[in-house]
């Protein structure tokens, strides 16, 4: 079903069965598959390919040569009906690739709201990107990677399969990340190592001084106390009971399976 207010360039192909919402614009030479749903106000600028069981929300901008929802690169994939879901108000720049999920990984690749994926970013099968993340040019996420809110991934960085990157993390350009990165941390290198708290980013997002002080103290517990993570967790949980921002650490460590960067 194509909404009567949608604008579709005559050189584009929209297969029968696709659902195209109100005020959607599909520019020249695009291909939209039969099982695709595109929400109101979204713009496909030109030469965009959207395939598979893919749902795209409202007011997204998708630039030329982006490929969304196509077959993933997992060698175990046998054509199972898996999905790609993209939220609202994302900017997906030129030549970005976002692959559908696998049956082994929950069957869905998910991108939330208000994210910016710059030129040549690759998001592999079963990744989950939350909200307000920025992935700079040529950043690569392997399968099953999770990015929590407000993560910044520098250009030319690569993140290993199954890695979790906590909220408000900043990864410097050219980083190779093979283990989980706790919330609020700045990291860089091959392999990426932590080098402090993302103070400037947190200030820009309205974190007050007492909260920043609490986050710094937890960072010191994790990285400078000389204790194991198991030894410091009771202290972190005590702080989290009083300071909600610290609860991100507690939730993160419950999910972490690969160990954390050191």
From Swiss-Prot:
Q: Record keywords: Cell membrane included?
A: no
Provide the species name. Answer: Pasteurella multocida (strain Pm70)
EC assignment: the record states 2.3.1.129
What is the role of the protein in this entry?
Involved in the biosynthesis of lipid A, a phosphorylated glycolipid that anchors the lipopolysaccharide to the outer membrane of the cell.
Q: What is its main location?
A: cytoplasm
The entry's protein name is Acyl-[acyl-carrier-protein]--UDP-N-acetylglucosamine O-acyltransferase
Q: Which domain of life is it from?
A: Bacteria
| Swiss-Prot/TrEMBL keywords | Acyltransferase, Cytoplasm, Lipid A biosynthesis, Lipid biosynthesis, Lipid metabolism, Repeat, Transferase
- What metabolic or biological pathway is this protein involved in? Glycolipid biosynthesis; lipid IV(A) biosynthesis; lipid IV(A) from (3R)-3-hydroxytetradecanoyl-[acyl-carrier-protein] and UDP-N-acetyl-alpha-D-glucosamine: step 1/6
């Amino acid at each position: 079903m194509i909404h009567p207010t949608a604008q579709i360039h005559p050189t584009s192909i929209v297969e029968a069965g696709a659902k195209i919402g109100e005020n959607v614009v599909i520019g020249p030479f695009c291909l939209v598959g039969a099982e695709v749903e595109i929400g109101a106000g979204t713009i496909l600028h030109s030469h965009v390919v959207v395939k598979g069981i893919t749902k795209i929300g409202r007011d997204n901008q998708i630039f030329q040569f982006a490929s969304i929802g196509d077959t993933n690169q997992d060698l175990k994939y046998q054509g199972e009906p898996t999905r790609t879901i993209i939220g609202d108000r994302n900017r997906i720049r030129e030549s970005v690739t976002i692959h559908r999920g696998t049956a082994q990984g929950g069957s869905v690749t998910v991108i939330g709201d208000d994210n910016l994926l710059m030129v040549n970013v690759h998001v592999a099968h079963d990744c989950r990107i939350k909200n307000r993340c920025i992935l700079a040019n040529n950043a690569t996420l392997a399968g099953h990677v999770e990015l929590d809110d407000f993560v910044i991934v520098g250009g030319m960085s690569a993140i290993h399969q199954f890695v979790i990157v906590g909220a408000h993390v900043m990864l410097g350009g050219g980083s190779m990340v093979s283990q989980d990165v706790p919330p609020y941390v700045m990291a860089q290198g091959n392999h990426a190592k932590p080098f402090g708290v993302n103070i400037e980013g947190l200030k820009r997002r309205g974190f007050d001084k007492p909260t920043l002080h609490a986050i710094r103290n937890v960072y010191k517990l994790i990285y400078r106390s000389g204790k194991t993570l198991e030894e410091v967790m009771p202290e972190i949980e005590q702080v989290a009971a009083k300071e909600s921002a610290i609860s991100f650490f507690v939730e993160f460590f419950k999910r972490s399976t690969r160990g954390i960067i050191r």
